[in-house]
Amino acid sequence: MRAKPASPKSDPEDPGLRTFTLAGHLLAAPKAAPGLYLVATPIGNLGDITLRALETLAGVDIIACEDTRITRRLTERFSITGLLKPYHEHNAALARPKILERLAQGASIALVSDAGTPLISDRGFKLV
């Protein structure tokens, strides 16, 4: 039996609950508090991601990512359907003010790179 896909929208019965799947099981992820979350992603094997990273990605309002195609593979594998926004060296100057504005409005945003931890050899350092 396959787990039902996750939804980035709040459950009408519990507005603070979001979900993701792991090994075919549907798991709960609380809605993330407002703020910027730096989330490390696996280098090579998607199965190496941490439970905390999955909870964070499922719980945030926006996932700012280096390459949406790469991050989409990760989010689809774990049934995380959230709003992916590109944030990389070619659009950082334009995207950064928008992200900062959303943060000021109370959004929760995860910053991820294609592999590894944001800020290590990428443009994330200017946002943080």
Regions found by a protein language model. Name each.
Residues 1-8:
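N-terminal acidic, proline/glycine-rich, low-complexity intrinsically disordered segments
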Residues 8-90:
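Glycine-rich, flexible N-terminal cofactor/catalytic loop recognition
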Residues 53-59, 102, 126-128:
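Catalytic-core regions built around general acid/base machinery
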Residues 75, 101-104:
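Short helix-loop hinge/linker segments at domain boundaries
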Residues 94-100:
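Conserved helicase ATPase core of P-loop NTP-dependent helicases/translocases
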Residues 104-128:
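Short glycine-cluster motifs
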